[in-house]
């Protein structure tokens, strides 16, 4: 099995090294094509107005001056060419990608791009807690990752579907199992704007998530990681809401 590994945190990210370890438990044919720099939050953007710069880091490892989606396209269509990957793994992201995070995430977008190209694709993320990004428990993803991916592949991924996996903020031995969970929803009041002024008196802003408490919905990915379970959430490319489609069709037919 040929595996293409990518991420949105960049070629030097510790989560990428973790995912390479996971991939090598599954196959000895692993290729890495990742962004040259951190591309967190770029979602499914493509570099249409800038050239893509490709740098070979080592054998079967490449860095791209571009987005995660650029990396998947370049990896599949140029680097691997006629012998494309059987699986795209994206991550391991530095921080959870749950609830509406999936709409912003470059990690999810890379898996989405793989799915568009007809390749089985899985996004993996490691949650962090009060200790922040500097205290991520990568061993959680490292220990459980290959087993979860293997089970997903054995179960099967239908065309048009990608799978989002999140590992909880705990030691590997403290994981309370796997939860197949729906995408959750946060209160967007948790998104804060930090207004500042630079040395020349000009305003600038940072977007951040406020550290406020909220109650995650039952059966959601948010609830799963809060309970120290690994969340597995199938996502689909088709964003059509069928009930609303039917309701609108009836309304406009009148």
Swiss-Prot record:
Pfam families per UniProt: SurE
Localization (cell): Cytoplasm
Catalytic activity entry: a ribonucleoside 5'-phosphate + H2O = a ribonucleoside + phosphate
Binding site for a divalent metal cation: 8-9, 40, 93
Gene3D superfamilies hit by this protein: Survival protein SurE-like phosphatase/nucleotidase (3.40.1210.10)
Domain of life from the UniProt record: Bacteria
Membrane-spanning residues: none
Family note: Belongs to the SurE nucleotidase family.
UniProt-listed PANTHER family: 5'-NUCLEOTIDASE SURE, 5'_3'-NUCLEOTIDASE SURE
Role of this protein: Nucleotidase that shows phosphatase activity on nucleoside 5'-monophosphates.
Protein name (record): 5'-nucleotidase SurE
Gene: surE
């Amino acid at each position: 099995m040929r595996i293409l590994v990518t991420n949105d945190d960049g070629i030097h990210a510790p989560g990428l090294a973790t995912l390479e370890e996971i991939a090598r438990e599954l196959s000895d044919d692993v290729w890495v094509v990742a962004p040259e720099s951190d591309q967190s939050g770029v979602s499914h953007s493509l570099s249409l107005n800038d050239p893509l710069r490709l740098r070979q880091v080592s054998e079967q490892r490449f860095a791209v001056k571009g987005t995660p989606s650029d990396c998947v396209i370049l990896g599949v269509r140029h680097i691997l060419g006629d012998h494309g990957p059987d699986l795209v793994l994206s991550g391991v992201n530095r921080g959870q990608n749950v609830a509406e995070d999936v709409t912003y995430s470059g990690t999810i977008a890379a898996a989405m791009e793989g799915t568009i190209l007809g390749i089985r694709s899985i996004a993996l993320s490691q949650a962090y807690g009060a200790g922040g990004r500097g205290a991520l428990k990568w061993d959680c993803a490292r220990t459980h990752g290959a087993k979860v991916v293997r089970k997903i592949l054995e179960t099967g991924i239908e065309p048009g579907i990608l799978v989002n996996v999140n590992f909880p903020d705990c030691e590997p031995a403290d994981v309370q199992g796997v939860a197949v969970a729906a995408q959750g929803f946060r209160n967007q009041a948790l998104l804060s704007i930090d207004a500042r002024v630079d040395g020349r008196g000009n305003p600038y802003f940072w977007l951040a998530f406020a550290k406020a408490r909220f109650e995650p919905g039952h059966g959601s990915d948010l609830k799963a990681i809060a309970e120290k379970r690994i969340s597995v959430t199938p996502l689909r490319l088709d964003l059509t809401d069928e009930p609303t489609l039917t309701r609108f069709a009836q309304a406009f037919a009148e």
